[in-house]
Amino acid sequence: VFPDKAAVVDQNRTVTFRQLKAEALHIASYIAGHFSRCHAPICFYLDKSAYCISVIMGIAYSGNFYTPIDTKMPAARIEKILETLENPLMITDKKHLPQVQKFMGDSDVLCLEDALDEPYNEQVIMDIKDRMIDTDVLYVLFTSGSTGNPKGVIIGHRSVIDYIEWVTETFHFNENTVLGNQAPFYFDNSILDIYTMLKTGATMYIIPQIYFAFPIKLLEYMETNLINTIFWV
């Protein structure tokens, strides 16, 4: 509906809805063409940026479900998550590839830069879409784990659809909404930001983490960028 409107803004680039979808379809085509996975876990290990949203959408378009991995997460926790997910595919970029290879071993690792260069395979993606149903898993987020072991919470497409329908109707979010994202993508508060943006055509600003240490600078950033909606803890 708003192809040339800003969808996601981070400190390095502004991505329109058209660009976001195009990047996601390239990523989905790469996953489908090189790994032949469906209804399978795919993790991503990336710095927080607009590329994370492209990856999230690309994984969903490929018929799989995603788990964000924080680049600051201890190796022991990452290993437990990977063990729980039972050999997931991992998406990372060239910057983080050496780190990822240390804990992934011989498991499948997809480089984001390669995926973005992959031609969009419309037929393959449409075939995947035709086989998907609303109860398919969309993501698995891991809690801190009170026992020391991270526990995965499984959420399906229908749950997110119903939640975002309720959120947008209750709070009257629309294309004029400007979201200020604070929550990490591995935390469920980010679901409101991401999927409100995708449903309504709102713009989501990924606020640089440094601003949260300086309240006045944070308020100036929000005022400059006309941010009118926040969901923070």
What are these regions (language model features)?
Residues K151-G180, D188-T229:
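Conserved AMP-binding/adenylation subdomain of ANL enzymes
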Residues T71, P88, D117-P119, I207-Q209, ...:
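Short, surface-exposed, polar/charged, turn-prone segments marking secondary-structure boundaries
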Residues V1-I161, F171-H172, G201:
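Carrier-protein-dependent adenylate-forming modules in NRPS/ANL systems
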Residues T92, C111, I155, Q182, ...:
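A conserved hydrophobic position in a structured secondary element of the catalytic/binding core
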Residues Q11, V140, Q182-A183, I207, ...:
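Short hydrophobic "strand-cap" motifs at the C-terminus of beta-strands
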Residues L46-S49, D70, A183-S190, I210:
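Conserved AMP-binding
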